[in-house]
Amino acid sequence: MADADLDKQVNTAGAWPIATGGYYSQHNSPLAQINKSNVKNVKAAWSFSTGVLNGHEGAPLVIGDMMYVHSAFPNNTYALNLNDPGKIVWQHKPKQDASTKAVMCCDVVDRGLAYGAGQIVKKQANGHLLALDAKTGKINWEVEVCDPKVGSTLTQAPFVAKDTVLMGCSGAELGVRGAVNAFDLKTGELKWRAFATGSDDSVRLAKDFNSANPHYGQFGLGTKTWEGDAWKIGGGTNWGWYAYDPKLNLFYYGSGNPAPWNETMRPGDNKWTMTIWGRDLDTGMAKWGYQKTPHDEWDFAGVNQMVLTDQPVNGKMTPLLSHIDRNGILYTLNRENGNLIVAEKVDPAVNVFKKVDLKTGTPVRDPEFATRMDHKGTNICPSAMGFHNQGVDSYDPESRTLYAGLNHICMDWEPFMLPYRAGQFFVGATLAMYPGPNGPTKKEMGQIRAFDLTTGKAKWTKWEKFAAWGGTLYTKGGLVWYATLDGYLKALDNKDGKELWNFKMPSGGIGSPMTYSFKGKQYIGSMYGVGGWPGVGLVFDLTDPSAGLGAVGAFRELQNHTQMGGGLMVFSL
């Protein structure tokens, strides 16, 4: 049953009702009042402090004359009337046990909110999912999705389609068994749950699963590709982003890395971690699944954004899905059946794979950059952060170009054995991270890169000192917007990547910019608040280079460019 209210908002050019910009997760906008010729005149219009520090990922929502803003832990939510944004209409500030923060990997972030049926759907780190009346903030329902006592927490932005709320838990670094959960939008009742590992019934494989590509694997593999019962603590959590095709009624997402990181402790392909899924929204049954990195040994959690487009393939308009994975590969597949069409390296520095075999879908590994116990891996590219992480990228349908925020970071990796203990980190590796080899001065760790999605080839690159963690926004005025870890919001010319405008915000940016229109005026919004995995050293005052799973050493200079904060800045002409 379709949500007419949400569908209306999705088709309203000036609204921003979904964290990724729409069902297709293209993160773009037809708004063009701000363009290349006048962007130099953009100024700060207003700002809002969340009153919370730590990393502020994601972006606010705009529905009608209301904006909804979230914060990092304790996951506060604020409703602002755009007629008077200085006044808070309502606020929801949950009380949570601070011990939850200790089991959250890589900062206490919150990636955003969802909207549907006149409700704001939010999650809390402590595993609770709630629906609030969008007008009053009253709690309509509240359910428990996951349990922090075993290391399972919520950081993902919920996703609403039709009468369903999709939600996944974090916690693969603590051995949490991943699953996608579907709840009734109006009641909060659990409709179905599909795990990443285990029996075919628990993974919810359709009878014709992977019938178009049986070489991807089909039945019984959620247990057979694991040693013993290791699949029960095998990770595969999904804390990233969803996309949805209303015509096919399929939704798409990625399951994450297997646990532990130490690959010696879990022989086998470890299905169905590291998989792109196409599932029926109503039943949760998987029509197809493509495992990008069998037996992942680098923490390349494949939960990143799935961008849906329709493009000609061999002369026929084809429904496609494109995905830049943490493993450094840009994939394009037929989203109806999972056929692999493109698999290209996003940067020449990628060395863990020599290539991806398009016939089998299997990556061809280079054993020199493996992480086995008898081999200390050095100069591994990408690092565990991936050449792409949680940032939301943008797509220009006219030029068929994807504008991506990338991390140009490599690593050394030393594994060690450890036992599983519920609620404790289950990693088994010590990492050192540092800039990749291809930057102009060999010190750059970030890129904004434009890709032709028909070929997977790069068009242009804009280098950044730090990882481009938050992703990009494309607006029809020909501008690519993004926030930087050192605190700038920037606008680039979409044709060549030339920087046309920037503004220094109060703290570093790890969220994804958004845009909306109100009373005939276009606005650009960007969260600020340094943190996330790159900012853990700054946020928690860590000095050991290997701390923060290797991030502290790579980003030790970040503290010289920005400090902690938390809020939203809004810009206009």
Curated annotation (Swiss-Prot):
Keywords for the protein's UniProt record, in alphabetical order: Calcium, Cell inner membrane, Cell membrane, Disulfide bond, Membrane, Metal-binding, Methanol utilization, Oxidoreductase, PQQ
Catalysed reactions, semicolon-separated: 2 Fe(III)-[cytochrome cL] + a primary alcohol = 2 Fe(II)-[cytochrome cL] + an aldehyde + 2 H(+)
Predominant cellular place of this UniProt entry's protein: membrane
Pfam families: PQQ (PF01011)
GO CC, any one term: outer membrane-bounded periplasmic space
Compartment annotation: Cell inner membrane
SUPFAM superfamilies linked to this entry: Quinoprotein alcohol dehydrogenase-like
Cofactor binding summary note: Binds 1 Ca(2+) ion per subunit.
CDD domains: PQQ_MDH
Amino acids binding Ca(2+): 173, 257
EC numbers on record: 1.1.2.7
Active-site residues (renumbered): 299 (proton acceptor)
Top-level taxon: Bacteria
Cofactor requirements of the protein: Ca(2+); pyrroloquinoline quinone
Biological process according to GO: methanol metabolic process
Annotated membrane topology: Peripheral membrane protein
Disulfide pairings: 105-106, 146-169, 381-410
GO MF annotations, alphabetized: alcohol dehydrogenase (cytochrome c(L)) activity; calcium ion binding
Role this protein plays: Catalyzes the oxidation of primary alcohols including methanol.
Family to which the UniProt record says this protein belongs: Belongs to the bacterial PQQ dehydrogenase family.
Subunit structure: Heterotetramer of 2 alpha and 2 beta subunits.
PANTHER family (UniProt xref): QUINOPROTEIN ALCOHOL DEHYDROGENASE (CYTOCHROME C), QUINOPROTEIN GLUCOSE DEHYDROGENASE
Protein name in UniProt: Methanol dehydrogenase [cytochrome c] subunit 1
Native species: Methylophilus methylotrophus
